[in-house]
Amino acid sequence: MKQFKLISDYKPSGDQGEAIKALSDGIIAGDKFQTLKGVTGSGKTFTMANIIQAVQKPTLIISHNKTLAAQLYREFKTFFPENAVEYFVSYYDYYQPEAYVPARDLYIEKDASINDEIDRLRLSATFSLMERRDVIVVSTVSCIYGLGLPESWRDLRITIEKGENIEIEKLKKQLISLQYERNDAVLERGRFRVKGDVMEIFPAYMEDAYRLEFDWEEIVRIRKFNPISGEVIQEYEELSIYPAKHFVMPEDAIPNALERIKKELEERLNVLNKEGKLLEAERLKTRTEYDIEMLSEMGYCPGIENYSAPIANRKPGEPPATLFHYFPDDFLLFMDESHVTFPQVGAMYEGDRSRKQNLVDFGFRLPCALDNRPLKIDEFEKMLNQAVFVSATPGPKEIKYSTRIVEQVIRPTGLLDPIIEIHKSEGQMEHIYGEVKKRIALNERSLILTLTKKMAEDLTDYLTGLGLKVKYIHSEVETIERVEILKGLRAGEFDVLIGINLLREGIDLPEVSFIGILDADKIGFLRSTTSLIQIVGRAARNENGKVVMYADRISDAMKETIEETNRRRAIQEAYNKEHGITPKTIKKAIEDILTRENEIKKEAALAEAGPLINSLNILNPADRKKLIKKLEAQMAEYADMLMFEEAAVIRDKIEEVKRIGS
């Protein structure tokens, strides 16, 4: 059995070693819940990686947004290149859920755009969990949403052996039942093709395809190959092909599911008719009977997930199968930034329920649609075998549950938590201007946090009027634009960023050495102890880090934040003195999800492809074919690196080449 093998040039330092040992010992001893309370920049991810190697358990890591999940995924791929590191997030590029707004009598149909590469990565995660134990899955709260039954997904797989006798026609039917499509012209993910005595299958969860060679009905050769270049990668004696979708239904489950749906429809129609809701009853009857017919004939219907409970033979109210059900019982969970992630998990069910309740009440869906849902918080907690909560500011639930809380407050870089000063609100604008000017002289940046949009706008106008380069970030700014603004701040395109909540990015800003917190003494979640400590941590990447709290009194949250920050500074200073470390600002390349190296590759690829594409009309068919192969390889490389927007650009170029050549 393959073991987790951590590969890194670094060794644990500071208090990482103590944290790794304490938490690993706790896991081995059977402790259910523990907390790693680690400051910003202390190397919490590296500590997590060392724990995984020490305990050798299949691991799920949950983050609270896709951006941070992608960062963690890349880091763990680097730490464990010989093991299965997978990525499981929502596969929707765009998602408008089905909904009904009674006040406006407005029904909104479900509308979604699925990201093909993320769909592959999700399937790859469950495939790895079925086939091996050395698996790390990095996920968002997508892991608490309903997924197909793991038993069905596993039991429906096709096992193919060299020397086996099987009719090609029979194998074709088996693949179609697993929701693979036949396409003899183009071999793409989730498809297969047959040419003479050769069948090629492109599993929905892989980047490579399989080629089966037959001698009459005997399989004489099984090979894996690159579907773009055609290069043979490996020969096999046997292999398994898993379904192309997570939601699959064994044939023998269909009759029972249909009976349950029909019975529920009859019961629900009786209720609606008794209540005098004749329009709702007729609407529900028409919609559901159409779905029943589709399920009966095709084994599928639009919105099939709304019938997941009868299909899976679940009782009303029973939790759905989720990614957790694909893990073995002894799995380990890390909840990153748990002070945000834990409450987020708890909020998912209620939001989903309120939307679907309207659909049921007004005759758009059967009550079983309510069981196509995320896990409730108590169901989620029951699913956890052993968990480590990771945060600089763990919440009350983590602290209450944990049998041990392990601190990690020493930064190997020697950087100290910033100095905190308090300044009265009177004259705060002038004081901020003076502090920002000092930072500009040092080629450093500033963050200013306000409580209201009006204050942010006024401060932006004031500082801009004094000749400073300022930008204001607000809730209506899209995620991609937010990342671009943060990159601009780091690159020095402007000097000051003003906003209400600048915590949610989770992106390092080592150039920021000054943070001004307006209305620091106000009561509320934006000025709680947790929020203030997180804000202060933003300036902990710079050797000149300084935070000024503008307030007319010292609130309890301010007092606790200052005391905790001073405690951490003292520990770090003692460590630095003992080891002769002089703190230096972290030097980090300016990047978002993409590294600059990848940007250069992208620019080079587009520059190289551009002239060819522009002169397509003079290219002969052979040259066009070569160009398409080259572009497909580039597209696959971007997708590999989670550079989905760049992959989409190349995909569009490929379509352009094919269109002109047709």
From Swiss-Prot:
Extent of motif Beta-hairpin: 91-114
This one is known as UvrABC system protein B
Q: Which UniProt keywords apply?
A: ATP-binding, Cytoplasm, DNA damage, DNA excision, DNA repair, Excision nuclease, Nucleotide-binding, SOS response
Where in this chain does the record put each Helicase C-terminal domain?
A: 428-594
Please state every residue range assigned to the domain named Helicase ATP-binding: 25-411
Q: Name one Pfam family in it.
A: UvrB
Which residue numbers delimit the UVR domain? 625-660
For ATP, which residues are the binding ones?
Answer: 38-45
Q: Which organism is it from?
A: Treponema denticola (strain ATCC 35405 / DSM 14222 / CIP 103919 / JCM 8153 / KCTC 15104)
Q: Which PANTHER family match?
A: UVRABC SYSTEM PROTEIN B (PTHR24029:SF0)
Q: How does it assemble?
A: Forms a heterotetramer with UvrA during the search for lesions. Interacts with UvrC in an incision complex.
Q: What is the lineage of its organism?
A: Bacteria, Pseudomonadati, Spirochaetota, Spirochaetia, Spirochaetales
Family membership, please give it. Belongs to the UvrB family.
**Name of the gene:** uvrB
Q: Can you quote the domain comment?
A: The beta-hairpin motif is involved in DNA binding.
